[in-house]
């Protein structure tokens, strides 16, 4: 009989928080009402914890679980990605009887169609979508779904510097203060831009669900404007001007995303967890900048108040 080395006692007997496999690629079909299913090429990461008395986990069981669950659940298109990761995590717990918790993550790229802002040119964009489930043998369960989108951000600090410098030059040319202000209001003032990446993850429960499409809209609201793969000249003008009239720090991105999240899901329970992240690739620096917030809906409501439809706080 072949030895099962994983069951041996380790030389250093300490428990491990997470052992598993990453980068497992599978094809997943997601159901759409009245339309053809969406085809996702998805990457799965799966983990269990390991007690101190065992040398290793049986990794082949992880691959077996994913294959079995996908074959069962994807025989026809699934309704949502959270059901899939929950099922995988649940099967992991059943297969690894020594584990006290199991985790399953799914990352996919969703291709979406949209039109450019002025000419209505057809184009596509890539949105990343996530599903994550952590299940405990004690019955605990945390399920998150999320998205990552790209956009353009325009720096308010540099814009104010350019605006102040322009005002001085106009004053030297003989323009009065009122006229200078009218000129600066009429012309989008230059600044440096970034390509931003907004990430939004929200907890889901049996009684609270969040559509991926709405999360995408909320995440996009964090930035100065959307980006497009194809732009005609009129479209390019519209994008650049709109972005420069809606400047955002990376910190602003997370805060506006939080406010839009509360507006989009006004009835979300206070204890629902959310994760918000904005990362901007700087154009005039050699580094990126990042802002994050991990909170509950209740904590955000206490800090922001109840935002009305115009986007202002109703405190």
From Swiss-Prot:
Assigned keywords, A-Z: Hydrolase, Iron, Metal-binding
One term of GO molecular function: GTP cyclohydrolase I activity
Pathway in which the depicted protein is active: Cofactor biosynthesis; 5,6,7,8-tetrahydromethanopterin biosynthesis
Pfam families hit by this protein: GCHY-1 (PF02649)
Superkingdom classification of source: Archaea
Cofactor descriptive note: Binds 1 Fe(2+) ion per subunit.
BP GO annotations: tetrahydromethanopterin biosynthetic process
Catalytic reaction equation(s): GTP + H2O = 7,8-dihydroneopterin 2',3'-cyclic phosphate + formate + diphosphate + H(+)
Function according to Swiss-Prot or TrEMBL: Converts GTP to 7,8-dihydro-D-neopterin 2',3'-cyclic phosphate, the first intermediate in the biosynthesis of coenzyme methanopterin.
Family, similarity comment: Belongs to the GTP cyclohydrolase IV family.
Protein name, UniProt field: GTP cyclohydrolase MptA
Originating species: Archaeoglobus fulgidus (strain ATCC 49558 / DSM 4304 / JCM 9628 / NBRC 100126 / VC-16)
Phylogenetic classification of the source organism: Archaea, Methanobacteriati, Methanobacteriota, Archaeoglobi, Archaeoglobales
């Amino acid at each position: 009989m072949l030895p099962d080395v994983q069951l041996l006692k380790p030389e250093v007997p300490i428990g491990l928080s997470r052992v598993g496999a990453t980068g497992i690629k599978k094809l997943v079909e997601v159901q759409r009402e009245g339309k053809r299913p969406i085809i996702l090429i998805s990457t799965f990461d799966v983990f269990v914890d390991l007690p101190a008395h065992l040398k290793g986990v049986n990794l082949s069981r992880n691959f077996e679980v994913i294959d079995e669950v996908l074959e069962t659940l994807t025989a026809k298109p699934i309704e949502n990605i959270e059901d899939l990761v929950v099922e995988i995590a649940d099967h992991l717990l059943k297969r690894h009887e020594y584990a006290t918790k199991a985790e399953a993550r799914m990352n996919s790229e969703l291709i979406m169609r949209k039109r450019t802002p002025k000419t209505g040119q057809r184009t596509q964009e890539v949105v990343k979508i996530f599903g994550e489930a952590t299940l405990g043998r004690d019955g605990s369960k945390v399920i998150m779904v999320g998205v990552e989108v790209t956009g353009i951000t325009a720096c308010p600090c540099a814009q104010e510097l350019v605006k102040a410098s322009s005002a001085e030059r106009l004053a030297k040319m003989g323009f009065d203060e009122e006229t200078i202000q009218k000129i600066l209001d009429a012309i989008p003032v230059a600044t440096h831009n970034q390509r931003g990446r907004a990430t939004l993850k929200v907890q889901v429960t049996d009684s609270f669900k969040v559509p991926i499409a709405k999360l995408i809209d909320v995440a996009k609201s964090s930035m100065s404007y959307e980006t497009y793969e194809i732009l005609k000249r009129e479209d390019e003008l519209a994008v650049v001007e709109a972005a420069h009239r809606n400047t955002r720090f990376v910190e602003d991105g997370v805060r506006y995303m939080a406010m839009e999240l509360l507006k989009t899901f006004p009835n979300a329970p206070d204890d629902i967890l959310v994760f918000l992240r904005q990362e901007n690739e700087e154009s005039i620096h050699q580094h990126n900048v990042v802002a994050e917030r991990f909170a509950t809906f209740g904590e955000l409501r206490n800090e922001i108040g109840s935002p009305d439809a115009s986007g202002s706080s109703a405190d």
